[in-house]
Amino acid sequence: MIVDAKNLAMPPRLLPVSFSIEAGEIVHLIGPNGSGKSTAISMLSGLFQGEGEVQLLGKSLQDYDLQSLARLRCYLAQQDRPAFSVGVYHYLSLALSALGELDADSVQSALDEVCSALNIADKLTRNIQQLSGGEWQRVRLAAACLQVWPTLNPEARLLLLDEPAAALDIGQEAAMYKLIRMMAEQGIAVVMANHDLNRTLREADKVLLLNNGSCVAKGKPSDVMTVEMLESTFVTRVQRIEHDGKSCLLFVD
């Protein structure tokens, strides 16, 4: 078990919720705006304290120092572009600073693979202030993935992403999910807040459905994301259809 969260809470934004996360598991937090998704993810990072306890690899988050946490997990928060000006390659290099000395060939190999996956290899010589919103988000995603990339950081266990698909178009979003699945297949547990419910239905191994700070359901996507539960939570009409052997959600209001 990678994460064991017991009665995690930060009232009134998040009421007590308990769950566990296994190695290689992709967990999606879904729910309306203000339901507690970002709060839950921030508390899993160990940077924000509330009530309850989160254990990472059987040890309380509060017993780790920041340097140790940086090697075990990466937290990609929602944030605007920083005020400083730096090149994309330099920015990505900063993501590896917590890992100490690394083999240059291994770094270049990982950098090539991640940048190719997110289609930002041609952006490495650009300044981050010159990037579009979608380009900047992909650079941030690349930096987060590099921090916990298994060949560079064998201690890494957890990737926390708060609405990582923000500003991405459908092609870029597809590339992101492919990269996330690749990391999960290497044993990295991934927790992310998400608004694309069809993606959650297809991509998540486990779902936590939040509403008004409460976890109203958790489990497999097919069990949690029923028409009745989604209509009640999002206050809109939902239809579930089958297309090419896959379930799809239609929002008809």
What are these regions (language model features)?
Residues 30-32:
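The feature captures the beta-strand-to-loop junction immediately N-terminal to the Walker
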Residues 45:
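Helix-to-loop junction immediately C-terminal to a conserved catalytic motif
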Residues 52-60, 68:
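Conserved ABC transporter NBD signature motif
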Residues 107-123:
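Conserved ABC ATPase "signature" region
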Residues 127-131:
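Conserved ABC ATPase signature
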Residues 194-195:
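H-loop/switch region of ABC-family ATPase nucleotide-binding domains
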Residues 207-222:
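H-loop (His-switch) and adjacent beta-strand-loop-beta switch element
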Residues 232-253:
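ABC ATPase nucleotide-binding domains
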